[in-house]
Amino acid sequence: LRFFKNLVVNSYLAGTAEPGVTEDNFAGRISAGWRDGLWDVSAFYKEVGDQFNPEVGFIKRKGIRHGYATLGAHPPVEMKWFYKLNPYSEIHYVTDLNSMMVTRTGSAALDFHLRDGGTLGVKAVSRFEKVDTPFSIGEDVTVDAGSYSFGEVIGFFRSNASLPFFTYVRFYSGTYFAGKKRTVSLNLAGRIGYRLTAQVSSNFNDIVYDNKNISANVYGIRVNYSHTTTIHSSAYVQYNSVSDEMVSNLRFNLIHSPLSDLFFVYLDRRYANSGESIDQAVVLKVTKLFNL
């Protein structure tokens, strides 16, 4: 819904049905945003029940209440190398269904919009995570249950995406739970005509935890093809060096009306060395925008 030209309100309510499940099987979200030539202000509230089970992987975390707010500005400037600044801040606040905080992420950033079409930026991030179940981040290295406060600084450069070849580079440096982490993310993309785009990505993570050095790298290849202005298909393959997992994703997208889509997705996850299948899925998703 749009009000006063610049105010946009969105919401959804979804539920799942399974034998024996009668409560906590809904998910809902409401958001509002004000966007004009200078200001960008938005917020949302989302709640996902413990028993909400869409079976399609569109929900990252269940049993939570998630609040989010951001405030940003886009003042024009007259400088030799850039024409606009974008200072902004964000906060995510996540609790369980008993309103006990489990995650908090706050950030402040400044982006420079360059005259050649690129973007340069820096961001400072502060995080809090409550870990209920220990998890592994490498061979013989485990993040124990507990509460952790940590943070990082991120710098990035994105070149002009309208060029035949363009790149996106990010650098991360900071703490990671009870350790330290540095990450370099490299993305190189190319475009052939107006239909075909291909992208190669790599993430190199150097983690120091419990006096142990861990290299956790992720590599990916993505290909997008536009058959028409309303029919698109894509393929994505990702390899994780720590888990030795290969994930493949094939997607077909039909835009059947403005902001309304039909998605057909095939997912495959398996161990790269042995080829053993972990899981597979075929997903059909239909969305429809109603103007009231």
Identify the role of each PLM range.
Residues 4-7, 11-292:
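Exposed, low-structure sequence patches enriched in small/polar residues
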Residues 1:
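Aromatic-lined, polymer-binding surfaces characteristic
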